[in-house]
From Swiss-Prot:
Glycosylation sites: 343
One Pfam family matching this protein: MFS_1
Any one GO MF annotation of this record: transmembrane transporter activity
Organism phylogeny: Eukaryota, Fungi, Dikarya, Ascomycota, Pezizomycotina
Species assigned in the record: Talaromyces verruculosus (Penicillium verruculosum)
Membrane topology type: Multi-pass membrane protein
Stretches that traverse the bilayer: 80-100, 116-136, 146-166, 177-197, 207-227, 235-255, 276-296, 307-327, 349-369, 385-405, 406-426, 444-464, 471-491, 547-567
Entry's localization field: Membrane
Region (Disordered): 1-70
Biotechnology: Compounds in the chrodrimanin family such as chrodrimanin A or verruculide A exhibit strong inhibitory activities against protein tyrosine phosphatase 1B (PTP1B) and therefore, they could potentially be developed into drugs for the treatment of type 2 diabetes or obesity. Furthermore, chrodrimanin B, the end product of the pathway involving chrodrimanin A or verruculide A, does not exhibit the PTP1B inhibitory activity, while it functions as a potent blocker of insect GABA-gated chloride channels.
Protein name: MFS-type transporter cdmB
Length: 578
């Protein structure tokens, strides 16, 4: 599959200083006579201090593309094989976020490790969130193919450690290692898509991977429960090994490695470009905020010195990190120039809010089903399917519309409106709400999410210069991870506080501490029958109040769409650093 060389001329449709050019101005010669470009002629007029970031976009390479009829993409069957491998990798990486949830009771029984429960999930989350931006730099300076394969290898090693561990410490270590590899899988998959097809076809494939990410969120607890009940909990991690191996084989054999986007010579120069000083402050800052959110209101009161200390540590470290980024500019982990780009910052905020809303409902809808409708964890996952089907179907449909129409911005307006209406209706659920309500409300919410969840990735590929696409992709991926982590903790604290308040009002004679500590699936079996109606009302109120966090996020996400430019993905020669 090749692009038409005349498609280069469409770059001139945008103002020379437009962010969509990534700072690259097209000369009159390039605009008028693209076929007359000499390999030795410099036709790019670059703003000051931006020559380094477009090293790979040389005139010689552009001229060669023109002579050859455009960049070469893999054949249809090779592309299908590559996409299958990417789907396996993204599904397993996303699956690891939730698959352990239903296996934790069995694991704690085997290892006698009740105090370590929080670390089983957070160890994976800490390394994933902390190192996502690091992979953005690695993909910029080294071969996308080999960095991606290393990420897969590290993820596989972590999975093996988790599955084979003889104790709780080994499981926590394995989760951290798997998270380290997982940090590079999603953004790397998006960059491989950018290397294997023209821009106008990418929305469909990015939408497919985004839909799989959502499916994995719900499939995780179902698969974890099935493995734990019928085989062993260790297969929650062993399942990653064959899929990861197939992905590595497909990428190794069928993905043609592009040249690094920026070339560096000496080891010293490479270390300087990786911004190790910035990472020295960024990683502990992220760990501090995640620990504060995980412990606050659960293990420790919000006013506890540990929680306050973690928030203060986060604030100090992140301010130092921002200062380092401002000083380093082009060699920073997060280039300030990208943050100031209204398209990138808007897409990042949009992704933060919409993904945060999705994760809140992914966690708390099953809780509503288990506690109020008295179903098992497996059945609650099945009852959550209307949301997931809505997300997957509309993600693929909207991605196809973007490829056909060329514009992603309209769908980024539609998504918050529809999703916030669906989320608002879900927050009205009552103890006696029937199938029509919880199915219909979920479907509407999922449809809204599907229109918008994959679009931020399209934005950064459409508006950024090739050398900036890996960093832009990493920013969006980081926002996905951190958004879920932050807002689930916010919803958890809303739920905990409201539950205790409502129990005191509606069921003052009930043992509030015992009810709060009881799992959702055991609620109706441990509460006395004479108190059960009042307790269910209190539980329902607390959960739907937690839903308000997801409602607010869905509504506020539209603010991220407002600054976006209306840029078409059709007919543009924009590559991710080929």
């Amino acid at each position: 599959m090749q692009e038409n060389p005349k498609d280069l001329a469409c770059l001139s449709e945008l103002p020379a200083d437009s962010p969509s050019h990534g700072g690259i101005q097209a000369s009159p010669d390039l605009e008028s006579t693209p076929h007359d470009i000499s390999p030795d002629q410099d036709n790019y007029q670059l703003p000051p201090k931006q020559e380094e970031r477009v090293e790979s976009v040389s005139v010689k390479e552009d001229a060669k593309d023109l002579e050859d009829g455009g960049p070469e993409y893999p054949s249809s069957w090779k592309l299908a094989v590559i996409m299958l491998g990417l789907c396996f990798a993204v599904f397993c990486m996303a699956l690891d976020n939730t698959i352990i949830a239903t296996a934790i009771p069995t694991i704690t029984d085997e290892f006698n490790s009740l105090d370590d429960i929080g670390w089983y999930g957070s160890a994976y989350l800490f390394t994933t969130c902390s190192l996502t931006l690091v992979f953005g730099k690695l993909y910029t300076f080294y071969s996308i193919k080999w960095v991606y394969l290393i990420a897969i290898l590290v993820f596989e090693v972590g999975s093996v450690v988790c599955g084979a561990t003889p104790n709780s410490v080994g499981l926590i270590l394995g989760r951290a290692i798997a998270g380290l590899g997982g940090a590079g899988i999603f953004s790397g998959s998006m960059l491989i898509i950018a290397q294997t097809m023209p821009l106008e076809r990418r929305p469909i494939c990015t939408g497919l991977l985004g839909g799989l990410y959502g499916v994995a969120g719900v499939a995780g607890p179902l698969m974890g429960g099935a493995f734990t009940e019928y085989v062993t909990w260790r297969w929650c991690f062993y399942i990653n090994i064959p899929f990861g191996a197939v992905t590595a084989l497909f990428i190794l054999c069928f993905f043609k490695a592009p040249k690094p986007i920026r070339k560096t010579s000496s080891i010293r120069e490479q270390l300087a470009q990786l911004d190790l000083l910035g990472l020295l402050f960024f990683i502990p800052a992220i760990v501090s905020i995640l620990l504060a959110l995980q412990w606050g209101g659960t293990q420790y009161a919000w006013g506890n010195g540990r929680i306050i200390g973690l928030f203060v540590t986060f604030g100090v470290l992140i301010l130092i990190f921002i200062g380092i980024q401002w000083k380093k500019q082009e060699t920073a982990t997060v280039n300030p120039r990208l943050v100031k780009d209204r398209n990138v910052s808007g897409a990042a905020f949009y992704c933060l809010c919409l993904t945060g809303s999705f994760i809140v409902f992914t966690y708390y809808l099953p809780l509503w089903f288990q506690s109020i409708k008295d179903v098992s964890a497996t059945k609650s996952g099945i009852m959550n399917l209307p949301t997931i089907l809505g997300v997957v179907i509309c993600t693929i449909l909207s991605s196809g519309f973007v490829s056909g129409l060329g514009y992603y911005t309209p769908f980024m307006y539609i998504a918050p409106v529809v999703a916030s209406v669906g989320a608002g209706l879900l927050s009205t659920l009552q103890v006696h709400s029937g199938h029509a309500e919880w199915i219909g409300y979920q479907a509407l919410y999922g449809i809204g999410l599907g229109f918008g969840m994959s679009q931020p990735m399209v934005v950064v590929q459409a508006v950024l210069a090739p050398a900036d696409v890996p960093t832009g992709t990493a920013i969006i991926t980081f926002m996905q991870s951190i958004g879920g982590a932050i807002f689930v903790s916010v919803a958890q604290n809303v739920f905990n506080n409201l539950l205790l308040q409502r129990l005191a009002q509606d069921a003052p004679t009930a043992d509030a501490a015992m009810i709060a500590a009881t799992g959702a699936t055991s609620l109706q079996s441990v509460v006395p029958q004479n108190l059960l109606p009042s307790v269910l009302e209190a539980y329902n109120s607390a959960i739907t109040q937690a839903f308000y966090v997801g409602v607010a996020l869905a509504a506020v996400s539209i603010l991220g769409a407002l600054p976006l430019q209306w840029i078409s993905v059709k007919g543009k020669k924009i590559e991710a650093g080929a």
